[in-house]
Amino acid sequence: MNKPGIVTAIPRRRYRLGEFSLVVLGEIESNDDRDYRYIMAVVQGDDPQPGIYLTAERNREAGHGIFDMRLVMRDGEDVIGSSADWQDLDAFTDEAIRIVSQILNLGDEEPYRMM
């Protein structure tokens, strides 16, 4: 998995979604070439390592204020969309939870905010 190179980050939100824990990080310093605004890490049960990451990272080609959402999983990664909305914590979190629910087939589960 080509996971984000997080050096330091501040947890901004934490959710429970079924058997999964979702943590949204902000103020990210990384050791890769990406400029992250937010990262959602998805952990299943007691597994110490996230199995899925969703990132909002600055799109250098599209100009100021546009962020790409990148999905990173064990079998690869892909940019799945771009939006200026994802500079906002709540907009990013809502969209990331929707995507995680869809990928993991958790449509019947309600996210429970823990932080």
Task: Give a label for each model feature.
Residues 59-115:
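Mixed-charge, Lys/Arg-enriched low-complexity segments
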Residues 27, 34, 54, 92, ...:
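Generic alpha-helix signal with a bias toward terminal, lower-confidence helices
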Residues 9, 53-54, 96:
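Generic hydrophobic, helix-prone segments enriched in Leu/Val/Ile
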Residues 34-78:
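A short, structured beta-strand/loop element
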Residues 1-46:
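Negatively charged, low-complexity tracts enriched in Asp/Glu with abundant Ser/Thr
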